[in-house]
Amino acid sequence: ACITVKFNAMAEKSRYNYRVEPQDVDFTLRATIPSLGGSILNTAGIDAHGKGFGVDALNADNHSWVLSRMAVEFDCQPTQYTDYTVATWISDYGRVLSTRNFTLTDAAGREFGRAVTQWAMIDLQSRSAIDLSWVGDAHADAIVDAAPPTDKPRTIRAVSPTATAEHRVVYSDIDFNRHVNTMRY
């Protein structure tokens, strides 16, 4: 259940510009899903930082954001050197999860992708989730009165694997929260 907050008429979607660079493409010269996902996650971090609740601010209290769930849809993958914009906005804070939304548009303003992410705040020492009720109160002015661009992510149902693979974890697999890097799995 989400807390009730009054929407601030001044809160608007934030927009950040990107370009598909050579390191972001596959052999067809189209942006890879991990590179587009990376721009989505980078946008989340940049926007949170700009609003005063980025990882740097949270780390001072031994807290951090952790991506809990992510749902993405891409209609196409832009080609190398294509300029695009990622718009982001927060639609709600729940007790445990915050919902952040994204749309990706090309230079002509055509939407080609959308995402909804849900984030938990953790205590870095106990590694447990923190109640976000205070965040909704302290940062109600960051909430934008706009619907998510796609369905919120859901818990993945249990599967019975038919094959297994082993992967030895290496340095580059681990992020700053000491978790497996989001775009690796």
Q: In which residue ranges do the predicted regions lie?
A:
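Terminal targeting signals and extreme-terminal segments of soluble enzymes
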Residues: 6-185
